[in-house]
Amino acid sequence: MIQTESRLEVADNTGAKSVQCIKVLGGSHRRYASVGDIIKVTIKEAAPRGRVKKGEVYSAVVVRTAKGIRRADGSLVKFDGNAAVLLNAKLEPIGTRIFGPVTRELRNEKFMKIVSLAPEVL
């Protein structure tokens, strides 16, 4: 469950280390985002020679949440922290590598590029 002001780690190689959610997209008063949802983020911490700089605003897709995702069979998939992957204006990933596992739910949300780059799909 990601909401405005939530901090997330970045699961790609764009150079950003930490981002902060500034808006949950999808409705005028939408409060929470889960895995597969698109949010607006600002870069809070970045590597010195990365592709992105601190303070820049990007779209991102949530790939892991500590709250977890409930599957149709009743199982619950949780992670240690919250993570996102940065997207460009066409909603394609900016980075060329994804770190850590991602969930199968991203496949339904039309993020096949992220699923194919990920080292593990849960």
Swiss-Prot record:
It comes from the Bacteria. GO terms for biological process: translation. InterPro entries: Ribosomal_uL14, Ribosomal_uL14_bac-type, Ribosomal_uL14_CS, Ribosomal_uL14_sf. The keyword Protease does not apply. PROSITE patterns: RIBOSOMAL_L14 (PS00049). GO terms for cellular component: cytosolic large ribosomal subunit. Keywords: Ribonucleoprotein, Ribosomal protein, RNA-binding, rRNA-binding. Pfam families: Ribosomal_L14. GO terms for molecular function: large ribosomal subunit rRNA binding; structural constituent of ribosome. The keyword rRNA-binding applies. Transmembrane segments: none annotated. Binds to 23S rRNA. Forms part of two intersubunit bridges in the 70S ribosome. Belongs to the universal ribosomal protein uL14 family. Part of the 50S ribosomal subunit. Forms a cluster with proteins L3 and L19. In the 70S ribosome, L14 and L19 interact and together make contacts with the 16S rRNA in bridges B5 and B8. This is Large ribosomal subunit protein uL14. It comes from Delftia acidovorans (strain DSM 14801 / SPH-1). The gene is rplN.
